[in-house]
Amino acid sequence: MLIQRIDIFCDYVLHKPLERVLHILDNIEDYYSEFERVKKDKFGNKKLNKPQYEHLGKYWTRIINPPRGDLKGIHKSINKYLVEKIRMPGYAFGGIKGKDNIRNARYHKGQKYIFQTDLKDFFPRITNKMVYKMFVGLGFSHDVSAMLTKLTTYKGHLPQGAPTSTTIANLVFVPTGMALQVIAEREGLRFTTFVDDVTMSSQTDFKNVVPEIIKTITSDGYKISQGKTTYKSGITEITGVKMLNNSMTVTDKFKATYVNEKDLTSPRAKGLLNYKKRIKAVSRAKKK
């Protein structure tokens, strides 16, 4: 049973009196930082905006708005409550305990045909209205839903860098995700999401289904990244893991990153090596 009264929710979940929470909401601008961060891949390499701009040093950037002070603790409490009380969809692998990008890739191991797309500007496109509708749909009262929405959205959308954003994004995406799950079950496909990455795969060619998959995503207000939308057979990459015929390994980009490490005893180099070992271990492990 979800808590329905905002005063009780503040006391027992947020560990703050209602008056304090209302004060934070009245001064919400004071509780968010804002800075620009260069996008990096899973190995810590900066992402170039366009390959031809490499000599100019132009990189992809994103605006980060992490909560600070009491609001940061409130976000952590909200996230803990949601994770404990709400069952996450089985297809979701991002931001969920016991799941990660490697296990997401492993779910598609051995599949011959693979469709992938990236949800462009995923967090910024999730509006406060979508978040409020999600909370009400979960069974929270309108008062609690309104308060949670105001606490977890900033400037009208989900903020990048907030502890709650990935969990909330997973939950907001559920109607679209379940529609994609219906398509997957009908066509005998495997389907997963890893935050803003959507993957479907099969042993048989399903190219004729791809337009329906894309339409299902975009009709709910999401936008796909054309440059990251692919349909392939054979060797490919899924969420930073290279997929071979029936095994997984590190990507060519990872190999280049590791080779270029000057100090192989550094924490970064050790982290890269452990990542490689994890892919190997997960690839060999039997599916439960």
Listing of model-derived features with the role each one plays in the protein:
Residues 168:
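Conserved binding-pocket/active-site segment within a compact domain
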Residues 1-55, 59-162, 171-184, 204-288:
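Right-hand nucleic-acid polymerase module
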Residues 196-202:
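Short beta-strand->loop micro-motif that forms the acidic, two-metal-ion catalytic signature
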Residues 190-194, 228:
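Short beta-strand
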